[in-house]
Amino acid sequence: MPTIEQLVRKGRQAKPKKSKTLALKGSPLRRGVCTRVYTTTPKKPNSALRKVARVRLSSGVEVTAYIPGEGHNLQEHSIVLVRGGRVKDLPGVRYHIVRGALDTQGVKDRKQGRSLYGAKKAK
């Protein structure tokens, strides 16, 4: 236990914050190539077929990324943009694919909340 005098001289050292998206290597986004596109089931109590992809990133790491929105055009060898952000009911999925960037098309017929899904404004 330090004395008050020692704390006045040195102070406490803050613990460094641990990143939750290590594979991005400090970048906000990373480009990658889909190695496998498939569906998986969420953990209890939810039930669905969630669309996910295994992606080999430009940093050399292979991660599982979620494909948001209804319907997608991704297949093996598609070039995608990956951002951080986990999916709570899919264990091990800590990344999202950015819709409307590179080979990923935006969500068709989306009217509200379009920004996250790469959907253009309807004329």
Curated annotation (Swiss-Prot):
Modified residues (3-methylthioaspartic acid): 89
Record-level Gene Ontology MF annotations: rRNA binding; structural constituent of ribosome; tRNA binding
S-S bridge residues: none
SUPFAM superfamilies, A to Z: Nucleic acid-binding proteins (SSF50249)
Basic residues compositional bias, start-end: 9-20
Keyword entries, A-Z: Methylation, Ribonucleoprotein, Ribosomal protein, RNA-binding, rRNA-binding, tRNA-binding
InterPro entries named in the record: NA-bd_OB-fold, Ribosomal_uS12, Ribosomal_uS12_bac
PROSITE patterns in UniProt: RIBOSOMAL_S12
GO cellular component, one term: small ribosomal subunit
Region (Disordered): 1-21
Biological processes, Gene Ontology terms: translation
Alphabetical list of CDD domains matching this protein: Ribosomal_S12
Pfam families found in the cross-reference section: Ribosom_S12_S23
Keyword tRNA-binding appears in the UniProt entry: yes
Quaternary data: Part of the 30S ribosomal subunit. Contacts proteins S8 and S17. May interact with IF1 in the 30S initiation complex.
HAMAP family membership: Ribosomal_uS12_B
Biological function: With S4 and S5 plays an important role in translational accuracy. Interacts with and stabilizes bases of the 16S rRNA that are involved in tRNA selection in the A site and with the mRNA backbone. Located at the interface of the 30S and 50S subunits, it traverses the body of the 30S subunit contacting proteins on the other side and probably holding the rRNA structure together. The combined cluster of proteins S8, S12 and S17 appears to hold together the shoulder and platform of the 30S subunit.
Family under the similarity heading: Belongs to the universal ribosomal protein uS12 family.
PANTHER family, per the entry: 30S RIBOSOMAL PROTEIN S12 FAMILY MEMBER
Record protein name field: Small ribosomal subunit protein uS12
Organism: Bifidobacterium adolescentis (strain ATCC 15703 / DSM 20083 / NCTC 11814 / E194a)
